[in-house]
């Protein structure tokens, strides 16, 4: 009887740990993450204090914090080729990283680190040197900065067949030296690395290339991590939030369902389908059933995004900053519809797949500069600073814990819906005007459309909508309007 009770207790404890890894530890009603791709730590700290905190963002996904290989021209992907677990990159050193985490936590913005547990650097012509000056010899799988030697890696092989589980989880993804996570030494070093980041105050991790690691190995690693630190504002026994990169468009040998019990999973189907819809390849009316009916993961298990740093470079249906009108509409729908754990992208401009982030003549990252409207210049796109996006972060905060109601569509690509009695949004993706009296579900009053303008000192710089006693309001979105979306909510009442 004792053995049974003890075993049951262990099962309950394990289940609790797994469920806890889905909790992003947001402050208050905040519920949107932004990926500040390739930003420096000092710049992120300032952005948390000056913009993200005041605008109600919940967290930041930051680029890999550990030492990476120095590659000619400094392409973005060098950050995904580890040399050691020293916290020195072009984004800054350990002291700067720790200062960023502390300052962001103090203003209610959590930090999630992109981590590389699957592999180390690929082969390199000449001496491989990292951003901390550490030397390595990837050709013989020697990484003395950890240290790792050949016995810590799977035997070298290439992935030829994406329906072969062994190749996917044992061979080298684009030549990257594939760690053997079943080895005690490898597990120990990975856990030490993640625990060090936890000690510095991070809230969790985005796990790169998770599908290339056996889920049972990841389960052991995640389960061995320390709790988050109470001195950084986390409750007792809080577990790190885990979200895992698992590319699964269906029909895959390794599936997202193998990982979603361990933490959230990146829902790439969301990105593909929302791009299809707002590119006009699918009528918006079908979005009424958005979510699991589309074959997506359950809401609490899905990390959702319009684009990410990888697929924005791959073309196809995925929308990016290069199609700004449709991109803003897709992002507005993403943040208005109650599905998933939302992440928005903050990019730098690129002309080809390998483009480096903005850098100076010495190949050091440069800080973003801001124009008179608060947008970014000098090579940084900063979608999160576009009014249509940061105001939808505020909309999402205002309507948190409400459901969809009063869906309306024209049978094609004009749609509208309420979020409880707190928010209303409408879209026009047709080539003709939308002009309708619609149920907004809001109390009587005049509301500022947070897409076309800001509410500043009681005045709206954009459109406004009058809502009567019956909740009805006249909604107008012309086909040639700068934005094809209108959004109002209780916190934007004039």
Curated annotation (Swiss-Prot):
A single BP term in Gene Ontology: carbohydrate metabolic process
UniProt keyword annotations, A-Z: Calcium, Carbohydrate metabolism, Chloride, Disulfide bond, Glycosidase, Hydrolase, Metal-binding, Pyrrolidone carboxylic acid, Secreted, Signal
InterPro entries assigned to the protein according to its UniProt record, in alphabetical order: A-amylase/branching_C, A-amylase_C, Alpha_amylase, Glyco_hydro_13_cat_dom, Glyco_hydro_b, Glycoside_hydrolase_SF
Subunit structure: Monomer.
Active site: 208, 245
UniProt-listed PANTHER family: ALPHA-AMYLASE
Catalytic reaction annotation: Endohydrolysis of (1->4)-alpha-D-glucosidic linkages in polysaccharides containing three or more (1->4)-alpha-linked D-glucose units
Binding residues annotated for Ca(2+), in chain numbering: 118, 169, 178, 212
Cofactor binding annotation: Binds 1 Ca(2+) ion per subunit. Binds 1 Cl(-) ion per subunit.
Entry binding sites for chloride: 206, 308, 343
Enzyme category, top tier: hydrolase
EC number in record: 3.2.1.1
Signal peptide span: 1-20
Disulphide linkage map: 48-104, 157-171, 376-382, 418-441, 448-460
Single GO molecular function: metal ion binding
Cellular component annotations (GO), alphabetically ordered: extracellular region
Similarity comment: Belongs to the glycosyl hydrolase 13 family.
Protein known as: Alpha-amylase-related protein
Presence of keyword Acetylation: no
Cofactor: Ca(2+); chloride
Residues that bear Pyrrolidone carboxylic acid: 21
Residues carrying the site annotation Transition state stabilizer: 310
Intracellular or extracellular location(s): Secreted
